[in-house]
UniProtKB/Swiss-Prot annotation:
It comes from Nepenthes gracilis. This is Aspartic proteinase nepenthesin-2. The lineage of its organism: Eukaryota, Viridiplantae, Streptophyta, Embryophyta, Tracheophyta. It comes from the Eukaryota. Residues 25-79 form a propeptide. Extracellular proteinase found in the pitcher fluid of carnivorous plants. Digest prey for nitrogen uptake. Keywords: Aspartyl protease, Disulfide bond, Glycoprotein, Hydrolase, Protease, Secreted, Signal, Zymogen. It holds the Pfam family TAXi_N. Disulfide bonds join C124-C127, C130-C204, C151-C169, C156-C164, C241-C435, C354-C395. The gene is nep2. The active site is at D114, D315.
C-alpha cells in the first residue's frame, strides 16, 4: 500500500465516551487545537499486512523488505522536496493494520497504522476510482453522524495541500510509489472495538489509485501533525508492541492512559521536532557498538541538520534499519568480522550482508549490536539483528540509505519491544518484552 496511507500499523478500553452528533446535515462541533478531548485510553490489536495470506515465512520476509525499501526511498524523496511542492509526497507502503469502524451505524474496515503520516483516510462511495478492499466501501449517506468539513475549518487549514469547492474542503495526497488519494475532508464517529469517539476529522477518498497491495482500506496517521489520531485525541503518549514476523500473536497499539509507563532505567531517546518535516519523529542516536566494540561513528552522522537533511526517524512502516553509507559499512564490516561465517549473496532480496548457516546445525554466536541513544543503551536481541530470507541463510537486518544521509530506525529493531512515545516530555522509551504474551 502507499504512505498517507502514507504509508503503514488496537483489545480496547476507552475510559471516556463522547456523545455523537445526531444530524447528518449539520457541520458538527469540532474540537480545535486549543480544546481538549477527555483523555481516552485505547488499546487495539494490530496485524501484519500479509497476515492470513498463504505465504511461507521467507516470502513474508522478502515482501516486507521490498515494501520497506520502497518506503525508505519515498521518505528520502519527500525530504528532498519538502521545501515548496504543491502536492505533498509521502512514503509508500506500511506494515501493520488496525481494525476500526466508522459511522452510525458503523462499518468496519482495516487501515494501515503509520507513524510516518498524519492524515486519517478511507475510501468512500461514490467512487470515481477505488481499489479493491476486503470490506464494503464506506458510504457516507448511510451514516447519521457524518458531516463534511467547511473550508474555513482548522483541520482543513492544517492540510499541506487543499482546495475549496462550494465550501467543501478537498485534499490530494501523493505517495512515493506513485499512488494517490483525492477526496474531501469530513468528520465522523470512529469506533475502536466497543468504544466510540465522535468528530474525528478524516479524508473521504473518492479517487484512489495505485493502492490495494495490502489488506487495508485506508490509513490511520499516527504522526506528529495536527491531523493525526494522537493529536486529534489530545493524548500525551502512545505505545506499540510489535511481535516478530511470522508470530501468530497480535501486535498492539495503545493510546493515552492505556499506554503504560516504563520501568525506571529503561533506555530512552530525546524526540526532536523538525519544522521542515513536522510529521516525523526524529530520535537522538549517538553511536553504535558491535560485540562490545565502539565503532567510532561520529554522533554528527545521525544529527538532524538545519536544512532538514540527516537525522534519524523512528518508523513503524519501514522494515529494516537504514544508516548512511559510511555508518552502515562500519556496522556490516564489524559484524562480518565477528560472526565468522561464510558470506552469501542475497542482494536480490534487498539484503547486503548475509551468511550461510552451519550445515551441521551448530549454534551461531551472534555479535550483540547496541544502539547508543542519549538516554541509554538499547541492546538488540538476536531477533532484532538477524533476518532469514531463505533456508540456511541469515542476514543483517540493516541497510544503507541514500546520499541524503537520512537514518531510519526500522520495525525489526523494534519488535518484541514496548516502544513508548511520550509526546509531553519529548522522549521515546524502549522496554524489551514478549509482545504476544497475554
Amino acid at each position: 500500500m502507499a504512505s498517507p496511507l502514507y504509508s503503514v500499523v488496537l483489545g480496547l478500553a476507552i475510559v471516556s465516551a463522547i456523545v455523537a452528533p445526531t444530524s447528518s446535515t449539520s457541520r458538527g462541533t469540532l474540537l480545535h487545537h486549543g480544546q481538549k478531548r477527555p483523555q481516552p485510553g485505547l488499546r487495539v490489536d494490530l496485524e501484519q499486512v500479509d497476515s492470513g495470506k498463504n505465504l511461507t515465512k521467507y516470502e513474508l520476509i522478502k515482501r516486507a523488505i521490498k515494501r520497506g525499501e520502497r518506503r525508505m526511498r519515498s521518505i528520502n524523496a519527500m525530504l528532498q522536496s519538502s521545501s515548496g511542492i504543491e502536492t505533498p509526497v509521502y512514503a509508500g507502503d506500511g506494515e501493520y493494520l488496525m481494525n476500526v469502524a466508522i459511522g452510525t451505524p458503523d462499518s468496519s474496515f482495516s487501515a494501515i497504522m503509520d507513524t510516518g503520516s498524519d492524515l486519517i483516510w478511507t475510501q468512500c462511495e461514490p467512487c470515481t476510482q477505488c481499489f479493491s478492499q476486503p470490506t464494503p466501501i464506506f458510504n457516507p449517506q448511510d451514516s447519521s453522524s457524518f458531516s463534511t468539513l467547511p473550508c474555513e475549518s482548522q483541520y482543513c487549514q492544517d492540510l499541506p495541500s487543499e482546495t475549496c469547492n462550494n465550501n467543501e474542503c478537498q485534499y490530494t495526497y501523493g505517495y512515493g510509489d506513485g499512488s494517490t488519494t483525492q477526496g474531501y475532508m469530513a468528520t465522523e464517529t470512529f469506533t475502536f472495538e466497543t468504544s466510540s469517539v465522535p468528530n474525528i476529522a478524516f479524508g473521504c477518498g473518492e479517487d484512489n489509485q495505485g493502492f490495494g497491495q495490502g489488506n487495508g482500506a485506508g490509513l490511520i496517521g499516527m504522526g506528529w501533525g495536527p491531523l493525526s489520531l494522537p493529536s486529534q485525541l489530545g493524548v500525551g503518549q502512545f505505545s506499540y508492541c510489535m511481535t516478530s514476523y511470522g508470530s501468530s500473536s497480535p501486535s498492539t497499539l495503545a493510546l493515552g492512559s492505556a499506554a503504560s509507563g516504563v520501568p525506571e532505567g529503561s533506555p530512552s531517546t530525546t524526540l526532536i521536532h523538525s519544522s521542515l518535516n513536522p510529521t516525523y519523529y526524529y530520535i537522538t542516536l549517538q553511536g553504535i557498538t558491535v560485540g562490545g566494540d565502539n565503532l567510532g561513528i561520529p554522533s554528527s552522522t545521525f544529527q538532524l541538520q538545519d536544512d532538514g537533511t540527516g537525522g534519524m526517524i523512528i518508523d513503524s512502516g519501514t522494515t529494516l534499519t537504514y544508516l548512511p553509507q559510511d555508518a552502515y559499512n562500519a556496522v556490516a564490516q564489524a559484524f562480518t568480522d565477528q560472526i565468522n561465517l561464510p558470506t552469501v549473496d542475497e542482494s536480490s532480496s534487498g539484503l547486503s550482508t548475509c551468511f550461510q548457516q552451519p550445515s551441521d546445525g551448530s549454534t551461531v554466536q551472534v555479535p550483540e549490536i547496541s544502539m547508543q541513544f542519549d538516554g541509554g543503551v538499547l541492546n538488540l536481541g538476536e531477533q532484532n539483528i538477524l533476518i532469514s530470507p531463505a533456508e540456511g541463510v541469515i542476514c543483517l537486518a540493516m541497510g544503507s540509505s541514500s546520499q541524503l544521509g537520512i537514518s531510519i530506525f526500522g520495525n525489526i529493531q523494534q519488535q518484541e519491544t514496548q516502544v513508548l512515545y511520550d509526546l509531553q516530555n519529548l522522549a521515546v522509551s524502549f522496554v524489551p518484552t514478549q509482545c504476544g504474551a497475554s
